[in-house]
Amino acid sequence: MKMEVERKNTDGLRNELMDAPNLQAFLSANEANFSSESASMLLNEMLERKGISKASLAKQSGMSEIYLHQIFAGRNPSRSRVLCLCFGLNASLEEAQELLRNCGYAELYPKVRRDAIIIYGLLHGMDLFAVNDRLFSEDEETLF
């Protein structure tokens, strides 16, 4: 029987790294905790886990199916488009942060007004279009 290793959170890894006397030992002990998935692999995993079709994701993310297929084929979307995908996936804040990191973008930061509005939307189950309306009404850059 294959035993699944429990993944450590970022703070746990950071603390362990700070206390590590030997980098190689840290790297070897934590190999399973390092992210190696491409954005398209992570998106596919999230789609499957949430039972959402690509057509539905495109519609809920405010993008064309053609553009979505380009993302799944390896095209790197902008940070705003990644956030659109998060809303289309009904992602949790943690899932959104993971997808942003995986795509090479900064996490949402509550001290940034625009990010705070987006975080609120994710935490309160708002859809993309409601969040976009709120961003617009608050004179912040919309997601699309």
Region roles according to the model:
Residues K2-R14, Q97-G125:
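Short, charged recognition helix plus adjacent turn
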